[in-house]
């Protein structure tokens, strides 16, 4: 089972020591970059072992918080992860630690660049058993509602641009801050358009962020954060 997160502890602790309260650390809490088959949970015979997955995610979450993380962000999309983490971090003294759930995360073809960089492309079977089908609006909204009921403090749709139609309904049903994740494929498409002189990267990025705000996203996660800040 993945249960040694000492490397993550050292990185988080050193960042907080250097920047202190000038930085807020939201730590993606998942297993895909450390499991042998690239899945977001522990697998046995091409199926997810939910008990072992929750255990490892709990160890990770508590390790991150002990190191100084401000918010944990489970992105695994397994059943009842938010509920499990809320309980286990509470037992370890982090009852007030916020959880930002990747609550409406779709099985998408737009994650390719990240998976290549993290070497986390799934092997053996795909992620359709736990990530959402892109055509099921009702299930996606229900997923966020369920995560809110389990104790999530922040909700999210992912990928960003292909999910903006869900934000308003999720917010009205949960009354929780709901954001978007502009994923690696979205980001790469803008940089490639710029490279081929078919569009200006900064203009494309700015336009996409304005669309997220128009859709009432409360926060935006993007690989272009530092780029857009330098142009504001």
Locations of the language-model features?
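Alpha/beta enzyme core
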Residues: 1-232
């Amino acid at each position: 089972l993945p249960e040694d997160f000492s490397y993550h502890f050292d990185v988080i602790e050193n960042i907080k020591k250097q920047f202190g309260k000038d930085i807020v650390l939201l730590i993606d809490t998942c297993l895909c970059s450390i499991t042998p088959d690239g899945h977001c949970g522990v697998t046995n015979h091409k199926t997810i072992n939910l008990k072992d997955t929750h255990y490892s995610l709990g160890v990770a979450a508590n390790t991150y918080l002990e190191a100084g993380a401000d918010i944990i962000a489970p992105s695994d999309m397994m059943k009842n992860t938010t509920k499990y983490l809320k309980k286990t971090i509470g037992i370890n003294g982090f009852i007030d630690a916020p959880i930002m759930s990747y609550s409406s995360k779709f099985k998408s073809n737009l994650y390719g660049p990240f998976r290549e960089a993290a070497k986390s492309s799934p092997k053996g079977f795909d992620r359709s058993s736990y990530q959402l089908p892109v055509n099921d609006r009702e299930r996606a909204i229900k997923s966020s509602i369920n995560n809110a009921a389990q104790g999530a403090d922040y909700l999210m749709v992912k990928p960003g641009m292909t999910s903006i139609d869900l934000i308003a309904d999720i917010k009205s049903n949960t009354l929780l801050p709901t954001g978007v994740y502009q994923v690696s494929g979205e980001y790469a498409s803008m940089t490639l358009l710029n490279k081929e002189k078919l569009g200006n990267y900064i203009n494309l990025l700015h336009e996409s962020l304005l669309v997220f705000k128009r859709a009432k996203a409360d926060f935006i996660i993007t690989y272009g954060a530092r780029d857009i800040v330098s142009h504001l």
